[in-house]
Amino acid sequence: MKYLVVLLSFLLVTPNASKPLFEEEKTELCNDGICVVQFNAKFNAANEVTWLDDLTDCSTATVDIMADPSLPQDYKIVVVPTILVLEDGEEVARFQANIMMTMEATRDEVQESIDNIIMSKF
């Protein structure tokens, strides 16, 4: 019993024990301001957005929602792929796939949301 208490105490005081892994990545990714994150899953790799790296004036990342079971709930991901545009870590735009899990939003539409964020600072 004493060992169980020690083990539980260790788990409770371990830093970032309950912090989702993506939170650390998001902090680093969005450090420069605007970042675009595609949430997808391996089972839907055929519908992955391929133009994400073509976006300008932002950082980009693709995250597998199966890697962290809390991601769909934390980010309200109901269909994949879902693209979030984040400014300083906060969601400012969301683009979701249709019922066939195909992204209908275009690169130009996502880029426009990025450009609007930049223009709003002037």
Residue map of PLM features:
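N-terminal leader/targeting and pre-domain segments
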Residues: 17-32, 109-122
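Local sequence-structure signature of Cys/Sec-based thiol-disulfide redox active-site neighborhoods
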Residues: 21-57
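Structural micro-motif
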Residues: 75-87
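Extracytoplasmic/secreted cell-surface and envelope-processing proteins
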Residues: 45-48, 72, 93-95
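N-terminal post-signal-peptidase region of extra-cytosolic proteins
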Residues: 65-70
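Sec-dependent N-terminal signal peptides
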Residues: 4-12
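Non-catalytic, surface beta->alpha helical segment in thiol-disulfide oxidoreductase systems
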Residues: 85-122
